[in-house]
């Protein structure tokens, strides 16, 4: 084994833009639209008919977003529609700017984002507020990610927006993921966790915070010991051998026996989650032997008319759901082109049921907010996957990327994953990119930050939190990327924590305290929850 060691050159962090879309996606779409190629040209014309692509749109920010109002937890009525409409407008205007170059749409997007960051202080409601955190948080973050390099967005305003995402949104989503409102692990259906993971992950990217990114993706990748619905192992909770499915399996999804409206929502959120990860070099699609595509095809097979699918009763803490839920059958959420183009045009894997669902859209073109009705379901996803995710067909199905994985080692510990939080500052860390069993190593490795390193394994001295990416080119000349996301202990956003002590009847916030022998002392941290204005005290 050959190692290359370095501190590193040209430190970098997350790819920007790098959530639902990369710069390559934006450049490709712009070129295809300008050339009049289909389906991009028609998909763009559809975008332009959206009620949200309007320079006359007036932002309607509120100090308090309410979802689950008129309850004992929140007396005021719901107003969350204002958030999802403005988020959709900011996102769609950002797309139009990138494709057309018309700065008026960029200014409109920035105007909306600034208005919300300056005005909104909290999210409130009953437990349904947790859906607002996840859904509208990831949507605002994605709109901002598309606008972050716009010269017309003042750096101070962008900084304020990022702080808003951290203070108003991050604590809400991570609070839900960690606490589940005091319920059992499997009480919440997968959509609740998926949208909150997607939001936290997006905030980590937007704010270049490795800790938050890793903290979020942990729930999707590794939480097998819990029965969280968003964890991949439980999201696609059972594999049924069936030659019609990808790799010879259909994957029964956690929401399949509930109803198809929610199963389709989970499919689209998972697709956006996978797409976001892959855009950072973190290929969520390929995890656990491409388990997620077995779920995609299962949901899409049933919703495209297949009746004889294998199915098992699903049991959670609230009961047993004996058979496929047929409510909302035929629901089609705007993410099918993302699924089809990754699997068919990158990986060379046929997904006939996902393609059929894509083609069931008018002219095979999906849309987004403003096209699926005025209620919240029509705004659960930013959409426009046909426009933004369509690729040229893969002519040679053998020219596909090699699936990579990674592991790290430091201070005598070896961890079979490429993303770790709380590594000691200054530790020497060994990064190793791994090929699948039986794959011949071409030796064609390239690290983004250190062109001199051309091996699959390297040592780095980790002085600050950051990401590393290695690219591998296989025998077919096709490249793939593996992300390593490493967080240094003590770094990252600290939130609204204040240290305190109590001694001899006095309370203070100093961290250097002089005490006498046998004095009674209580010290700890106080967390001010800006979402509900609750004070949580954690004495030690």
Regions found by a protein language model. Name each.
Residues 531-540:
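Residue-level detector of conserved catalytic or cofactor/ligand-binding positions
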Residues 456-468:
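Solvent-exposed segments in extracellular or luminal domains encompassing
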Residues 480-488:
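C-terminal edge beta-strand
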Residues 437-445, 533:
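Solvent-exposed loop segments of extracellular immunoglobulin-like
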Residues 1-12:
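Bacterial Sec-dependent N-terminal signal peptides
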Residues 11-181, 194, 198, 221, ...:
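Extracellular glycan-targeting catalytic surfaces
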Residues 426-436, 520-527:
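A short beta-strand segment in extracellular, disulfide-stabilized domains
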């Amino acid at each position: 084994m050959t190692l290359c060691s370095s501190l590193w050159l040209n430190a970098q962090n997350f790819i920007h833009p790098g959530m639902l879309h990369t710069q390559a996606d934006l450049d490709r779409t712009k070129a295809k639209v300008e050339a009049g190629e289909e389906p991009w040209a028609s998909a763009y014309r559809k975008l332009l008919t959206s009620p949200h692509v309007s320079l006359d749109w007036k932002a309607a920010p509120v100090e308090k977003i309410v979802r689950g109002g008129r309850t004992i937890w929140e007396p005021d009525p719901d107003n969350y529609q204002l958030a999802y409409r403005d988020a959709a407008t900011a996102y769609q205007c950002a797309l139009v700017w990138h494709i057309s170059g018309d700065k008026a749409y960029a200014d409109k997007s920035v105007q909306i984002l600034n208005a919300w960051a300056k005005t909104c202080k909290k999210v409130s409601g009953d437990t349904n507020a947790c859906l607002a955190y996840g859904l509208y948080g990831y949507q605002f973050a994605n709109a901002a990610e598309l606008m972050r390099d716009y010269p017309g967005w003042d750096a101070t305003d962008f900084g304020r927006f990022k702080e808003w995402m951290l203070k108003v949104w991050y604590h809400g989503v991570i609070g839900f993921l960690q606490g589940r409102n005091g319920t059992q692990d499997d009480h919440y259906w997968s959509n609740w966790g998926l949208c909150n993971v997607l939001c936290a992950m997006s905030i980590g990217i937007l704010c270049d915070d490795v800790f938050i990114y890793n903290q979020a993706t942990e729930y999707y990748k590794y939480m097998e010991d819990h029965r969280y619905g968003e964890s991949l192992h439980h999201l696609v909770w059972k594999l049924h051998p069936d030659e019609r499915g990808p790799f010879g399996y259909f994957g029964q999804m956690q929401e399949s026996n509930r109803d198809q409206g929610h199963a389709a929502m989970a499919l689209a959120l998972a697709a956006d989650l996978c797409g976001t990860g892959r855009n950072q070099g973190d290929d969520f699609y390929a995890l656990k032997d491409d388990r997620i595509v077995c779920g995609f095809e299962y949901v899409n097979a049933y919703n495209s008319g297949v009746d004889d699918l294998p199915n098992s009763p699903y049991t959670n803490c609230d009961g047993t759901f004996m058979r496929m839920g047929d409510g909302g059958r035929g629901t089609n959420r705007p993410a099918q082109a993302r699924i089809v183009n990754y699997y068919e045009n990158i990986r060379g894997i046929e997904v006939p049921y996902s393609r059929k669902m894509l083609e069931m859209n008018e002219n095979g073109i999906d849309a987004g907010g403003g096209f699926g009705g005025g209620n919240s379901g029509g705004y659960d996803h930013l959409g426009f996957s046909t426009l933004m995710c369509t690729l040229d067909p893969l002519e040679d199905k053998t020219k596909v990327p090699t699936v990579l994985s990674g592991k790290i080692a430091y201070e005598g510990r070896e961890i079979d994953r490429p993303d770790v939080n709380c590594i000691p500052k200054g530790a020497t860390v060994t990064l190793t990119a791994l090929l699948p069993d039986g794959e011949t190593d071409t030796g064609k490795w390239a690290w983004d930050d250190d062109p001199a390193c051309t091996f699959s394994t390297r040592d780095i001295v980790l002085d600050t939190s950051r990401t590393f990416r290695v690219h591998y080119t296989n025998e077919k000349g096709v490249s793939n990327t593996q992300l390593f996301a490493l967080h240094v202990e003590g770094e990252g956003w600290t939130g609204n924590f204040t240290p305190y002590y109590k001694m001899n009847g006095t309370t203070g916030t100093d961290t250097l305290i002089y005490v006498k022998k046998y004095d009674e002392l209580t010290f700890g941290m106080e967390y001010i929850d800006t979402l509900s204005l609750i004070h949580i005290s954690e004495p030690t």
